[in-house]
């Protein structure tokens, strides 16, 4: 019998007997474990061989045998739990232990670095599952980061300095304002073994032609082997950077026929997905990666929803025991912000916008927050920390304003905290705030109407590219803000847009109201080398490494 199954049977027997040694019979024990008398005898003999108990059998009618426990079910359960942790079987661990506090304690104690059979393994604690990793779909901040570890694109953007670098394409050139040529590497392989072909690249780029920032791609052809020509309907100075974004990641052309591709995607990037469940994401270094092989062999993201309620939650590399240190911190390039929905009467009303912006000012929100949040929140006066576009102007409450609806996407504890503070402030002015939580996909599409929306945005480097690109790619914003987005996109592509002025106009009209910049923190011990936090609050797994243990 497999060891795990035998351990489960012993724990069950120990629990049924309440851990007490006793005189009993094979029939009684077999009834407890719902098995045959013969199988019960086999179990007892095997458990005795393992040193867990002794079974002194007595022969004869009416005679009772002696069962003595030498090992407790709790101790064996702990041992089994340790085995499951080492095997990264978090699903089974949760089922075995049951108690969330105990599971958390065990997970935290095993975070950080592990060196097993010559392999470097990094264990990370996160507050929610990362089930959708499909490029081109609605991806949140962390999913965007993970997708970059799994997939490659024609170009890539250096996370530290925002500079454009080669990826699948080793060189490129602009033939004319409407014609770009990219030269691709041969010998690139997908995680499932197949070699990348030009048809994969063409199919991947054509599938995103419906997205606003890629809608100007008129044609994609390969005139010669490993050469890709992209023809545009309008000039775009940002095209090479655009092709390094997550929507433009390269997928196998048969991706739609592959099982559960969104949660178990196949790319050509430095890491391949091994497991992705509600309790764990495991990615493993791809030995056939065309670039430098990752130095960390395996990354396990363990999911523990309970840490979502901790203000500094998010990403945890090392547990609080011992010498815990803050590895990296940075003020996010972005903010929480209010978005007024021009589709509703109250959302479009300028008096409502002015008054709500006044009473829900950044300083008010921070003032009414608990101290643990005040340490991590910084009042925002622009979409970026360096901008001071918003001015707090005293405004009178509009007559007849009695209620407002606020909507945000779920699985984000700080949304609830901020919304609760808003509800408290508005209630003091006799305004009821109705709060709605919807899925991230529903939020992204923006087909639901709400007076105001509570959103957050994290912009990546280079900011003069990503800020407009991010805002333009969220359909919700285009539904709520009635400006000529296509005309603005054309100006942006031509390099004719003053981005700071454009954002200032959105803030001045109260279409968007910056609220809070958040400090991004990675918690842990300084045992890892090469860790550089990016603007998404994560770090490039393939660039980090551990010094090997002392011999």
From Swiss-Prot:
GO biological process terms held by the UniProt record: negative regulation of DNA-templated transcription; peptide transport; positive regulation of DNA-templated transcription
InterPro entries assigned = SBP_5 (IPR039424), SBP_5_dom (IPR000914), SgrR_HTH_N (IPR025370), Tscrpt_reg_SgrR (IPR023767)
Superkingdom of origin organism: Bacteria
The function of this protein is: Activates the small RNA gene sgrS under glucose-phosphate stress conditions as well as yfdZ. Represses its own transcription under both stress and non-stress conditions. Might act as a sensor of the intracellular accumulation of phosphoglucose by binding these molecules in its C-terminal solute-binding domain.
Entry-linked HAMAP family: HTH_type_SgrR (MF_01449)
| DNA-binding region, residue range(s) | 26-49
Which residues does the UniProt record annotate as the domain HTH marR-type? Answer: 1-116
Q: Which UniProt keywords apply?
A: Activator, DNA-binding, Repressor, Transcription, Transcription regulation
Q: Does the keyword Transcription regulation apply?
A: yes
Report what the protein is called: HTH-type transcriptional regulator SgrR
User: Entry's PANTHER family?
Assistant: HTH-TYPE TRANSCRIPTIONAL REGULATOR SGRR, PERIPLASMIC BINDING COMPONENT OF ABC TRANSPORTER
Do the record's keywords include Transcription? yes
Q: Where is this region: Solute-binding?
A: 163-492
Report the GO molecular function annotations: DNA binding; peptide transmembrane transporter activity
Which Pfam families does the record cross-reference, listed alphabetically?
SBP_bac_5 (PF00496), SgrR_N (PF12793)
